[in-house]
Amino acid sequence: MDIANLIQNLKQTLQNASNERHLIELKNIFVKQHLLPLYDELKKSDNKKEMGLLINEFKQQIELITNQALVELNNKSDQIDLKKWANKTLFTPFIKNGHHHIINNIIDDIAQFFKKLNFEIVSGPEVVSPVYNFDHLNIDENHPARATADSFFINSVQMLRTHCTTTTAQVLENNPHKDIRIMSFGNVYRKDDDDATHSHQFNQVDFVWVKEGLTVANLKWLIDSLIKYLFGQNLKTRYRLSFFPFTEPSFEVDVQCFKCDLKGCAVCKKSTWIEIMGTGMLHENVLKAANINDIKTGMAFGVGIDRIAMLKYEIDDIRYLYSNNFKFNAQIK
């Protein structure tokens, strides 16, 4: 029995198959003619072991050749001759390309800044416990934000977060013995009436850095570096003492108006300064709530991404950022 010659004949036969069903039929005919009779001969053979091995090898080669032929047949059916059917004169409607939203672009820019400083970029749940939204952040029971008139409560133990600092509180609690460098971002919710400068939902970036030896000087250096990175200018900054429950001391950060050359304009409301973010050193009660060693100090800031977008691109109505107006979105890439 010349197996090599039979296999060669099978290859040539299967090349004539017009489709998968035809190919299987040709294979079955070959098996019936050349493989099955060998089993009858095996019964009469004096050397059943040797002949059995030969038959098994023959069977495996038949399956291998059939599978190869099937792959080749499928490849042929996938090849389309474009010249035969393509109509180059056929009208194709213009498809407008999409691009990242400016909110996403600014978040990406800030994330890249912090990645260069080895900060971890994290995000947390938007539905949180008041424990993390208020209690662990030194916001007492009489604070106005805890009222249902100012915050969205789902029930007594769940609410929509009013700031991304909730993620900070959870990270601090889960890593009390580590130096912490994180930037968190996401949607936050407050019961504001929607108008040109307010929205019940907006985007925020929050950062926290905890280790031994951090001071206000480190905080100022970091924020000044971020502002320069975002706006591409050596803008002057001003730190005004303020109050936030979770930081002490607390500051409002202003930048010198970059639109009017200190002449006063609509962007800075004629003051030549633009309020841009709140910041400060983490309050000792926030660190205690997370069981962090009192030797360590921490600093944090929170900034509204929507506000940064409005300042950077001179947008006078925050609602443009959410209106899905293609003409508006196409102007800013």
Curated annotation (Swiss-Prot):
User: Where in or outside the cell is it found?
Assistant: Cytoplasm
Sorted alphabetically, which PROSITE patterns does this protein's record hold? AA_TRNA_LIGASE_II
What top-level class of enzyme does the UniProt entry assign?
ligase
- Name the cofactor(s): Mg(2+)
One GO location term (cellular component): cytoplasm
- Which keywords, in A-to-Z order, does the entry hold? Aminoacyl-tRNA synthetase, ATP-binding, Cytoplasm, Ligase, Magnesium, Metal-binding, Nucleotide-binding, Protein biosynthesis
**A biological process term (GO) from this entry:** phenylalanyl-tRNA aminoacylation
Write out the GO MF terms: ATP binding; magnesium ion binding; phenylalanine-tRNA ligase activity; tRNA binding
Listed EC numbers:
6.1.1.20
Q: Where are the transmembrane segments?
A: none
Can you state which reaction this protein catalyses? Answer: tRNA(Phe) + L-phenylalanine + ATP = L-phenylalanyl-tRNA(Phe) + AMP + diphosphate + H(+)
Query: Which residues are involved in binding Mg(2+)?
Result: 248
The note on cofactor binding and number reads: Binds 2 magnesium ions per tetramer.
Q: Give a single Pfam family match.
A: tRNA-synt_2d
Q: Which family does it belong to?
A: Belongs to the class-II aminoacyl-tRNA synthetase family. Phe-tRNA synthetase alpha subunit type 1 subfamily.
Please name the PANTHER family in this protein's record: PHENYLALANINE--TRNA LIGASE, MITOCHONDRIAL (PTHR11538:SF41), PHENYLALANYL-TRNA SYNTHETASE (PTHR11538)
- Subunit description: Tetramer of two alpha and two beta subunits.
Annotated protein name in UniProt: Phenylalanine--tRNA ligase alpha subunit
Organism expressing this protein natively: Ureaplasma urealyticum serovar 10 (strain ATCC 33699 / Western)
